[in-house]
């Protein structure tokens, strides 16, 4: 359907329609005009500043492809013979780690990158389009210097004529819990070994302030942990080890990973180095001076909130808003965010942060090793033994971690180092 949409002018003349898509092709920040995933399709338009006339055309175009797409044998064949500009998320749905993560999931059998079965039946595509492309299931996000009132009027006028309503609820895509095991995966996605110490929990939506404050506390604990390990590695002059931290929500599973990049022959030793620091933090907590430094940094960032917000690119703002919608995170105005965040930082203590860290680091974790294809497979039993020898003596301090640990998204932690 998106390929058909990209070949039609949506009520505009062909030149106007092409120019709208071309605005989205910024060589410095490439964004595909359409991204298809397992449960959603995202159409992207990027317009020049101060061209509100183009905004009106864009809304008209999007409304047309959303409800008035022409689907016939001719338009299908034309789309198939045209350049395919539609991207998928993930970009490589066949990559080894992603296929491993999908095991036991409801997503299996719904690969957005699967090749079309030929011959293509236009009538079936039309039926799918009418069933799922309904206005009650659409979300429109506009970011930029626009007049909110006039844009709202344009939206109501342009999209108000669309017909149709979902009769069948869309199935909710979910991932299975991540198994706490040691696994080696051969992949083209890495050039050297990358070991991920990974844990996940069910994701809980954030709909009120108490849940938001719990999430912030858990997230700040993770950030404190990341910087502590990074500083310890630097202080000890650790060689041949790269450290990254990645937290995200994937289809109702909240997933965090400490990523260790290492030469193959030093992998076991480097895992031991990181595990010893994790065990030390779990058992003894972070020193108060590190806590104070982190809170001071967060207070400084909060003072610069509006300046940072004003400099943030529109595609990043849209990505943040999309994540909030997908993960059912309540929308907060910047002013309210600033007040809540300041109150949170003022009330936080090192004891609260260390309790969160103890909970998070007391979970069963998976060891996921990504290896470049062609490399001999690493003996994962050795890595598991190293990990267990350091991390196994866990006290019964934290049995339930889902309350605080279930919100690792929209994080301040840098995704890669």
Spans of model-derived segments:
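Structured mid-domain segments that build the active-site/substrate or prosthetic-cofactor binding neighborhood
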Residues: 211-288
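Short acidic (Asp/Glu) and glycine-rich catalytic loops that position anionic groups and cofactors
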Residues: 39, 133-135, 195-207, 249-256, ...
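Second-shell loop/turn segments in exported
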Residues: 2-9, 41-52, 63-73, 85, ...
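M16/MPP (pitrilysin/insulinase) zinc-metallopeptidase core fold and M16-derived inactive scaffolds
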Residues: 1-48, 92, 107-112, 223-253
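Acidic/histidine-enriched segments that form metal/cofactor-coordinating
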Residues: 19-128, 174, 181, 272-276, ...
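Extracytoplasmic
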Residues: 27-29, 38-42, 78, 120, ...
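Proteolytic maturation boundary segments
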Residues: 141, 147-202, 206-207, 211, ...
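Sec-exported extracytoplasmic/periplasmic mature domains
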Residues: 2-11, 25-26, 48, 60-71, ...
């Amino acid at each position: 359907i998106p390929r058909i949409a990209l070949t039609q002018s949506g009520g505009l003349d062909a030149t106007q329609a092409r120019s709208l898509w071309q605005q989205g092709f910024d060589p410095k920040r490439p964004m595909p005009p359409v991204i298809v995933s397992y449960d959603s399709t995202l159409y992207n338009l990027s317009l020049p500043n101060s061209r509100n006339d183009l905004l009106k055309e864009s809304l008209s175009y999007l409304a047309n492809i959303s409800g008035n797409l022409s689907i016939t044998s001719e338009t299908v064949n034309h789309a198939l013979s045209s350049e395919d500009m539609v991207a998928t998320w993930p970009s490589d749905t066949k990559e080894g780690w992603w296929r491993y993560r999908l095991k036991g999931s409801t997503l299996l059998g719904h690969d957005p990158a699967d090749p079309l079965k030929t011959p293509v039946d236009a009538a079936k595509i039309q039926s799918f389009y009418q069933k799922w492309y309904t206005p009650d299931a659409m979300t429109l996000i506009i970011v930029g210097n626009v007049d909110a009132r006039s844009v709202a009027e344009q939206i109501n006028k342009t999209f108000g004529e669309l017909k149709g309503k979902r009769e069948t609820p869309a199935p909710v895509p979910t991932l299975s819990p991540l198994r706490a095991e040691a696994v080696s995966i051969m992949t083209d996605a890495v050039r050297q070994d990358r070991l991920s110490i990974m844990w996940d929990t069910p994701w809980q939506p954030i709909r009120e302030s108490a849940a938001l404050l719990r999430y912030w506390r858990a997230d700040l604990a993770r950030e404190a942990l990341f910087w502590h390990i990074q500083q310890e590695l630097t202080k000890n002059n650790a060689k041949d080890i790269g450290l990254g931290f990645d937290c995200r929500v994937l289809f109702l599973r909240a997933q965090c990973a400490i990523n260790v990049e290492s030469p193959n022959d030093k992998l076991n030793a480097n895992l031991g180095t990181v595990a010893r620091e994790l065990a030390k933090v779990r058992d003894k907590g972070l020193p108060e001076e590190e806590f104070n430094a982190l809170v001071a940094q967060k207070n400084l960032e909060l003072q610069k909130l509006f300046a940072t917000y004003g400099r943030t690119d529109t595609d990043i703002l849209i990505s943040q808003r999309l994540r909030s919608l997908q993960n059912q995170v309540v929308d907060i105005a910047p002013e309210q965010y600033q007040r809540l965040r300041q109150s949170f930082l003022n009330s936080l203590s090192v004891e609260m942060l260390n309790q969160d860290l103890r909970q998070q680091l007391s979970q069963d974790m998976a060891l996921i090793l990504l290896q470049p294809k062609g490399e001999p497979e690493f003996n994962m039993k050795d890595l598991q033994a190293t990990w267990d020898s350091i991390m196994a003596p866990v006290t019964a301090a934290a049995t339930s971690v889902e309350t605080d640990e279930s919100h690792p998204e929209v994080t301040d932690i840098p995704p890669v180092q």
